[in-house]
Amino acid sequence: MRTVPVLLLVALGLAGCAGAPRRPAPPSAGRVAALPAAPVLGARAAELAAHLVGTPYRFGGESPAGFDCSGLVWYVYRELGVGLPRTAAAQHAAVRPVPADELEPGDLVFFYMPEDHVGLYVGDQEFVHAPKSGRGVERARLDAPYFILGYAGGGRVAAGAGP
């Protein structure tokens, strides 16, 4: 019976990110080639994401003025010259799947809680994400029970992708 309250908390916890309006991806943000990311690209993405911790949450946000979950990931990779789709679901479809035990800094981590949610893995079982209104961009533990429950997989961004 404890699973019902946990599921309810999970659903409420990330509902803020889920409601972002679905916009068509920019023309340059098609499917990313399924090539492994250069370690340097991933490390730079993780470093940039870590520097954005504390930025406010903003529904539909995709700039340092405020981010939603997929806007944060989109912004980080755009700053590094890599084009990604704008929504969490489209980002999930655009990356090469990576098992949880092979995640590297810069990889994306996805959750269904109950809506699509995405964060950027920074190493040591930690990721950076924009969870919901009222909270800003923050670090979280991938191995926390809250995130284990809704984990949907990891993915690697191709180094050769670009806008």
Model-derived features: where do they sit?
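Sec/Tat-exported extracytoplasmic proteins
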Residues: 49-57, 76-84, 113, 131, ...
